Structure formats: structure tokens, C-alpha cells
């Protein structure tokens, strides 16, 4: 049964009623436009249940012997004997614009001029303005529950100056309903192709149908059973067609989750393709993720910034003048929260400000939540972190006191706040403050670090972390030891890692205790936990790396490995994603110092180029590093054996490689091409080729392996494989990013016959 508002295809072959309806529409058009179209045949019929039936008929007609396609919209109410042509347009001459939104051929016909005047009158009444209509520049229409008209028009303002405006007008003709949804100043530069715009009614049947289509495609590809619930947000972008960005809720095995999909639509070709479909999280698209807006100076965002500046001027009796937007971020809350960094002049001096503006478009609601001076040259960011220039301003002292009070209450402690030493902030779902401060404990001054999560618009404040740092507060990116590895927070993290491992590997480890915990400030926090777990009744030592973003309720096991069992077989080599992480720089420096001492040399460490690790009874690190020898840069390789639980560290090998053999981008030969790691890579490439080409190659052996440091590692493998029992030589290129568990065959080709 047809859903109210939904478009449904109607079988039309050999049905005289649709021919008659099309002829009726042609006669109506000819009469109104003094034309001489001749109806030929119906091509397509859709219907929509409104207060009656709306028919969308696509048909062929000729004029002056030229055959073209037209579309007519005809409203029928049989009980009133009503038949009315609501829309009529040419669709065969590229007049159809992408995405369900179509250009109207005569923007200044009486009907559209009246709609534009209606929008201007509505604006004048609401804003006590005196705009006067001049002309329509462009009209587009979109089928919603009714018709949405997008009119770009020229009007003169109070000063007699001609300006460009955009109006969105929603019309339900059968109900005699007309509403101005939006009216705004555009300026002389109308938004260009490629801009992403919010769609006002994400659960309009059209967009629900698109979301259901994406879910069906995903279910079919992945053999899953998602069930659509609702759309949370829809954005659209004019491309060669229309790209829809839909955030939706769906049920997976009874659990509600959030997904994002990108759907490309070319309506005039009846083309629809799911470009992307991915899990976002259980709540990442609710009060949640902050995303960058691609065009911060689009008229919409400039208007928002001007609104914030005006609001500030009114409340502070100031005289700021808006210049431009520098950055715009948006966040889906109950409506949309915009974070705008803007430039404005104050008494002629250009300064930077930050504004937070809450918008609920469907209620015509707009409120400035926050407006503040950032500085004359905006603070440099450290990976999304911004230094706050005045750490002891009352606002930040109050935040710290709040954290100290909370800590005292939780720990039955008696810290007394002294002063803030440093404040950083990070835009998350709200703001995360990283405050380093001094406080006295039993009369002794100590250094602490706290993380406080604030959502101003919800009056929400939470201490995410509070810890003793000491006199050398850990810097961003540095790895620091945690003093109490078995506190409940870290035991819970370790159990989470063990459970994750058990699930993935079908194992049965049982957590016992933590031996050591380190943490590193990244975009969130990276925890390095050395733990004891029981495997088949035997105690073993494992290492887990867990990435936590508390403000997103995000927790992911990056790595879990056995390190402490002497029976462990020497294993595969693993690339380390961040070779210049302080931990690995310290190891490289240790190796250089050891070499200098043994050889009475004077090498000076510069940087790491590559780090690999190998699971043995402990860990062997293979570090390719740069050091200077008598002022000349050279490349060295070091092998360092580490057993962290014994505080054991030994340089097993240190040697000169060359002046450039290990530079990023340089290709080097791997000494053991048939080690299991490289055989596995070659098999992966062969399987990928077989799947794509419907081939039946069988891997035999590797002949040669080269590797190249890129954003990850590129492997160039020459291998032998049999094809219909004939041995041949192939070359493959495989990109590996171990830390993302990413592996992709870039190239696979036949080189020659192995028997020759």
C-alpha cells in the first residue's frame, strides 16, 4: 500500500487514462503559453498520495516537428471532480538539475513572481524591513510533501541598493498552504557547484527511501540484516548529479547503531549508487561529532558570523566590524551547533574571535552561546590542541578549583589550589581542557594535571582525569608511567583488551593483574599496559595498546601481543607506525651511546627512519636511524633486545648501512624473501588477483622482496606461481599500514615464464 507522501511507480502501458491526463496537461500548457505542443506517448507515470492523487507523468510531445520529453504534475480529487495541472516542464534539454531539484524554465512567470513577493512580504513583516521585489534570477523546485521552491531573487533594500536574496518556500497547493522556510541575503556571488547544504526535513519520504536503498545495498554486499529506523541528518551536494550525505540510525542484531552513507543520484538517468556506507558508532551522530565545513565564507556562514558580531556589539556596547570567517565547524546537537573562528576589526585593529552559535532551523531559532577574543595571531595548535594565552584568568582558575574539589571529594584528600601553569583546549563534543597546575598537599607544593570536559550549552562539566605529574609535567606525545597500574580504571582497560583478544582469536585468557601502565597524550589517550593473564592454566605476560577518547565514549585495542613467555617462537616483524615516538627515540639514543662507548666513537643521534619489532622472549627492535659522524649524516641499523618486565635492554647489533639506503622513499632489498611474513603477503596478493580476475594461480615461492618507507610500507615482491600447472613469474606491489590493519594490492602483473 502506498505511503502518504511517497512516490510510487504506476504501470501505464495501454492505459488510456494516462494518455488522457497527459493530453489534458498539454492543452493546459498550450493555452497558457500560446504554444502548439502535440502529445505523442507516455513514457513514465508516478503517483503520490496527497489530499487526492498527484500524478507525475513523463511523456513525449512534438513542437515544430522536434520531439522532446516533458514532465507534468497533475492533481486529481475525484470526489470533487478536480483535475489541475500543478507543474509542467521540459526535461529533455538538460533543464533537469541533479538530485530531485529541477530548474524551472521561466523564473519570472506570474506564479513565481508572486511566490517571491510573498517571501519578501513575509521577511519585511518579520524583520520590519522594506525590501522591494525587482525580479527572479533563478527558480528551482523539489518534490517534498508538496513542493519546495528555491528562488534566487533581486530586491532593493532601504537604501535603494540592489541585492541578491535566496528564499525557500514550501507549498502544498491542495491545502492552500504556503510557508517561507528560509530567506537570506546571498550577495553578488551565488553559491557555486560543490557546496554542501543541510536538508531541512531529513525524514521526508524521499530521504528515508534513499537511506533504505543504502541499507539494502549494504545488507546484500555484507550479508547482514540491518533494519532502518530513522534519518538523523541529511546534507546534499551538487556534483554531476546530487550527492546525499545521510546520517541514519539502524538496528543490528537488536542494537540501535549510527551509520553514515553517501549516495550519488542522477535522477534524469534513473541512476542511484551507494558510494560509501560505514558504522559511525552508537551515539557519534547525536550530541556528538564535530566536522569541518568546507566553505567557511559561504553566505550562510558569513550571515551567522555577522549575527554573532551584532549580538556581541549589542550586549557589550562594542563596535566590532565583521571581516571574514577563518574556520567553521558544525556539530549535530538538538539542531546544529556552529563553531566559527572569524576576523573582525576593533577600532581599526584586526583581531580573531571565536563564536558558538546554536541553530534550530525548523523553529527559526538562533542563539549565540559563546563569543570571545582568541588573540591577534591565533594560538598555534598542537594536533587539535590550542594553547590558552591567560591560564590564570578567573574562568580557568574556577575550572581547576572545580577539579580539585571533585578530587578531594572522591579521594578524601585535602589539596589546596595554588595557580595554573598551563591550559590547553581541544574542540571535541564541547571543549576538553588540559590544565597543568600547582596545588599543595600537606603543605608541600606539587604539580598536577587534570582534564575537564565542558559542554556550555548543556551546563555540563566533568573531570575526565586528575593525576600527580611531579615537577616535569609530561608534554603532548610523551609517554609517562602511571603510578598505580592496578587501580580499577586500568584493570578495567586491561580486561577490555583481554576480552577483545578472546573474541577475535577465539581464546580463553583470564586476566590476573597489571604489571605496568604507561600513557601517551595523542588525539585522546594511548595506554600501554603490560599485564599478566592465564592461558590454559599457565601465567603469561602480554602487552596491550588501547586508544581511548573518553568524550566520544570511544575505546579501541590497537595491539595485543604475548611478550613474557620464554616458549614464544621468534615471530613476524611488525612495522611501528610512529618511529619517532619518544619511546623509540630513547631506544635509538641508547644504542648510539652503547656504540660510542664500545668503539670510542662520537656519533650524534639525529632521528629514526624506520622501526620494526619482533616478538621473541621479550621484544627485538630493528631501528634504522640517522646519526652524524664528524658532522656527516649517515644511516645505521640497530637491533635492541628489550624485556620490559625485567628492566632489561641490550644492543644486539649496530652497523653502518650507508648514506641513503634507508631514507623515506628509498627502496631497499629484504634479506629473507621467504620469511613467513613475506610469503603471507605474496599469498594475499595472489588471492586478491584470483578473486578479481577469476584466476587459479597457486603461490610457489618468493624470488625477491624490496621495501620502501611511504605512509606505511610499500612491498615490491617478485614471486613464482603456477597457472594451470605452468610456473610463471609475477610482480606485485602491496601497501601495508600495520597500525590500521590495512593491506592493499596496488599492482599485480605477469613478468615472464619461470621455466625460461
UniProtKB/Swiss-Prot annotation:
Induction: By wounding. Pfam families: Cystatin (PF00031). The record marks 5, 99, 194, 288, 383, 477, 571, 665 as: Reactive site. Residues 3-96, 97-191, 192-285, 286-380, 381-474, 475-568, 569-662, 663-756 form the Cystatin domain. The keyword Cytoplasm does not apply. A motif (Secondary area of contact) lies at residues 48-52, 142-146, 237-241, 331-335, 426-430, 520-524, 614-618, 708-712. One of its GO terms (molecular function) is cysteine-type endopeptidase inhibitor activity. InterPro entries: Cystatin, Cystatin_dom, Cystatin_sf, Prot_inh_cystat_CS. It comes from the Eukaryota. Keywords: Protease inhibitor, Repeat, Thiol protease inhibitor. Disulfide bonds: none annotated. Expressed abundantly in tuber and leaf. Probably has a role in the plant's defense system. Belongs to the cystatin family. Phytocystatin subfamily. This is Multicystatin.
Amino acid at each position: 500500500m502506498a505511503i502518504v507522501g511517497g512516490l510510487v511507480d504506476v504501470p501505464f502501458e495501454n492505459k488510456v487514462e494516462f494518455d488522457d491526463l497527459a493530453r489534458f496537461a498539454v492543452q493546459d500548457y498550450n493555452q497558457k503559453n500560446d504554444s502548439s505542443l502535440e502529445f505523442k506517448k507516455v513514457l513514465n507515470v508516478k503517483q503520490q498520495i496527497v489530499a487526492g492523487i498527484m500524478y507525475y507523468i513523463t511523456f513525449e510531445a512534438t513542437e515544430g516537428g522536434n520531439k522532446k520529453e516533458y514532465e507534468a504534475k497533475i492533481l486529481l480529487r475525484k470526489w470533487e471532480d478536480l483535475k489541475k495541472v500543478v507543474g509542467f516542464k521540459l526535461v529533455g534539454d538538460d533543464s533537469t538539475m541533479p538530485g530531485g531539484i529541477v530548474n524551472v524554465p521561466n523564473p519570472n512567470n506570474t506564479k513565481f513572481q508572486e511566490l517571491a513577493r510573498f517571501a519578501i512580504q513575509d521577511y519585511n513583516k518579520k524583520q520590519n524591513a522594506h525590501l522591494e521585489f525587482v525580479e527572479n534570477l533563478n527558480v528551482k523546485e523539489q518534490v517534498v510533501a508538496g513542493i519546495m521552491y528555491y528562488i534566487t531573487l533581486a530586491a532593493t533594500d532601504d537604501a535603494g541598493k540592489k541585492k541578491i536574496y535566496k528564499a525557500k518556500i514550501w507549498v502544498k497547493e491542495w491545502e492552500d498552504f504556503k510557508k517561507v522556510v528560509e530567506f537570506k541575503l546571498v550577495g553578488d556571488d551565488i553559491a557555486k557547484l560543490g557546496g554542501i547544504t543541510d536538508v531541512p526535513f531529513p525524514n521526508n519520504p524521499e530521504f528515508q527511501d534513499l537511506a533504505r536503498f543504502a541499507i539494502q545495498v549494504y545488507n546484500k554486499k555484507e550479508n547482514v540484516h540491518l533494519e532502518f529506523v530513522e534519518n538523523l541528518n541529511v546534507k546534499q551536494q551538487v556534483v554531476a548529479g546530487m550527492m546525499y550525505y545521510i546520517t541514519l540510525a539502524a538496528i543490528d542484531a537488536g542494537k540501535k547503531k549510527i551509520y553514515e552513507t553517501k549516495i550519488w543520484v542522477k535522477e534524469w538517468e534513473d541512476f542511484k549508487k551507494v558510494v560509501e556506507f560505514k558504522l559511525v558508532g552508537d551515539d557519534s551522530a547525536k550530541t556528538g561529532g564535530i566536522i569541518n565545513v568546507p566553505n567557511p565564507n559561504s553566505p550562510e556562514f558569513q550571515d551567522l558570523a555577522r549575527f554573532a558580531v551584532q549580538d556581541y556589539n549589542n550586549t557589550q556596547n562594542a563596535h566590532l566590524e565583521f571581516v571574514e570567517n577563518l574556520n567553521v565547524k558544525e556539530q549535530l546537537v538538538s539542531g546544529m551547533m556552529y563553531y566559527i573562528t572569524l576576523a573582525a576589526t576593533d577600532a581599526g585593529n584586526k583581531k580573531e574571535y571565536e563564536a558558538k552559535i546554536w541553530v534550530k532551523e525548523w523553529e527559526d531559532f538562533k542563539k549565540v552561546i559563546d563569543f570571545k577574543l582568541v588573540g591577534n595571531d591565533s594560538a598555534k595548535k598542537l594536533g587539535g590542541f590550542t594553547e590558552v594565552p591567560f591560564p590564570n584568568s578567573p574562568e580557568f582558575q574556577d575550572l581547576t578549583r572545580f577539579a580539585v574539589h571533585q578530587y578531594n571529594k572522591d579521594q578524601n584528600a585535602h589539596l589546596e589550589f595554588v595557580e595554573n601553569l598551563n591550559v590547553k583546549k581541544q574542540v571535541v563534543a564541547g571543549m576538553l581542557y588540559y590544565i597543568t597546575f600547582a596545588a599543595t598537599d600537606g603543605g608541600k607544593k606539587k604539580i598536577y594535571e587534570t582534564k575537564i570536559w565542558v559542554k556550555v550549552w548543556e551546563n555540563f562539566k566533568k573531570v575526565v582525569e586528575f593525576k600527580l605529574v611531579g615537577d616535569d609535567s609530561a608534554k603532548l606525545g610523551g609517554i609517562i608511567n602511571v603510578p598505580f597500574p592496578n587501580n580499577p580504571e586500568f584493570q578495567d582497560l586491561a580486561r577490555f583488551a583481554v576480552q577483545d583478544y578472546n573474541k577475535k582469536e577465539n581464546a580463553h585468557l583470564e586476566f590476573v593483574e597489571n604489571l605496568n601502565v604507561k600513557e601517551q597524550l595523542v588525539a585522546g589517550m594511548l595506554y600501554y599496559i603490560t599485564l599478566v593473564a592465564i592461558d590454559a592454566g599457565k601465567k603469561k605476560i602480554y602487552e596491550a595498546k588501547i586508544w581511548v577518547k573518553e568524550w566520544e565514549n570511544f575505546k579501541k585495542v590497537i595491539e595485543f601481543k604475548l611478550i613474557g613467555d620464554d616458549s614464544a617462537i621468534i615471530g613476524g616483524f611488525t612495522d611501528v607506525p610512529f618511529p619517532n615516538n619518544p619511546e623509540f627515540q630513547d631506544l635509538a639514543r641508547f644504542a648510539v651511546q652503547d656504540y660510542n662507548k664500545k668503539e670510542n666513537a662520537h656519533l650524534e643521534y639525529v632521528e629514526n627512519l624506520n622501526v620494526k619489532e619482533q616478538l621473541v622472549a621479550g621484544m627485538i627492535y630493528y631501528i634504522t636511524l640517522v646519526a652524524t659522524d664528524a658532522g656527516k649524516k649517515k644511516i645505521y641499523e640497530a637491533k635492541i633486545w628489550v624485556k620490559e618486565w625485567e628492566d632489561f635492554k641490550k644492543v644486539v647489533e649496530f652497523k653502518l648501512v650507508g648514506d641513503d639506503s634507508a631514507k623515506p622513499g628509498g627502496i631497499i632489498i629484504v634479506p629473507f624473501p621467504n620469511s613467513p611474513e613475506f610469503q603471507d603477503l605474496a599469498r594475499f596478493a595472489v588471492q586478491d588477483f584470483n578473486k578479481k580476475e577469476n584466476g587459479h594461480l597457486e603461490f610457489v615461492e618468493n624470488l625477491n622482496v624490496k621495501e620502501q618507507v611511504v605512509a606505511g610500507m610499500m612491498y615490491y615482491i617478485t614471486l613464482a606461481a603456477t597457472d594451470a600447472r605452468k610456473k610463471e613469474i609475477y610482480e606485485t606491489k602491496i601497501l601495508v599500514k600495520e597500525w590500521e590493519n590495512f593491506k592493499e594490492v596496488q599492482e599485480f602483473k605477469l613478468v615472464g615464464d619461470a621455466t625460461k
